A protein has these predicted regions:
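Bacterial N-terminal signal peptides
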Residues: 6-17
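Boundary at the C-terminal end of the N-terminal hydrophobic targeting segment
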Residues: 17-24
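Secretory pathway targeting signatures of secreted, lumenal, and periplasmic proteins
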Residues: 26, 30-89
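Signature of long, low-cysteine stretches enriched in small and polar/charged residues
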Residues: 38, 49, 82-139
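A mature extracytoplasmic/lumenal domain signature
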Residues: 38, 46-47, 69-71, 112-117, ...
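Surface-exposed amphipathic alpha-helical segments
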Residues: 40, 142-179
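Solvent-exposed, acidic/flexible segments
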Residues: 47, 74-78, 128-131, 141, ...
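Structural recognition of the beta-strand scaffold that forms the well-ordered cores
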Residues: 66, 109-110, 146-149
Length: 179
């Protein structure tokens, strides 16, 4: 009994003594490992197409972060997907921001907009969701593009955008060759 108690106490001590970044939950998709930002929760993907899914709760409002990877030469180009994502927010043309970032060998395209989000599968029925926002990222790799998309109420997405971008850029570094 004393041994079990000692092991439990030691485990708790070690877990709390480690820096937060070493204790952080991670999500692995293909060659990338993403540290889940504090306050975000990893949940079971709601679709088999999703490789991982996170939830961000800010009071009663929730946003979701979804990860997709379809393989080499699958899922379309970064430009095609950014255009499709923006089309899910009709009338948002003046609020669209696209940024390109290079992290080692990984090209990242960030796409952000806000307005009424037409939620649903492409070509299927949609549900208009007013006051929503998008912050998406596409990581281009030889094994196929990785698509990461955060959608939810505008306030939640805007408050989470910096953490989202950090998660994505830090995750891109995990697949970059070590110098």
């Amino acid at each position: 009994m004393r041994t079990a108690l000692a092991v439990t106490a030691l485990s708790l001590f070690i877990a709390t003594a480690l820096p937060a970044e070493m204790r952080a939950e991670t999500v692995k998709v293909e060659a990338f490992t993403f540290a889940v930002p504090e306050g975000w929760t990893s949940v079971t993907p709601s679709s088999p197409m999703r490789k991982a899914q996170l939830e961000i709760a800010r009071g009663p409002e929730k946003a979701e972060v979804t990860f997709f990877h379809f393989g080499a030469d699958q899922g379309g180009s970064a430009a095609d997907n950014v255009a499709r994502w923006y089309a899910q927010f009709p009338g948002s043309e003046d609020k669209r921001i696209t940024e390109n970032v290079q992290v080692g060998p990984v090209k990242i395209t960030f796409a952000m907009t806000e307005g009424t989000f037409n939620s649903g599968m492409p070509g299927g029925p949609t549900t208009p969701m007013e006051g929503y926002a998008l912050c998406g990222a596409i990581l281009e790799t030889a094994s196929g593009n990785l698509f990461i998309k955060m959608t939810g109420p505008n306030a939640v997405v805007k408050a989470s955008t910096d953490a989202f971008k950090k998660m994505v850029t830090d995750g891109a570094k995990t697949a970059a060759p070590k110098v």
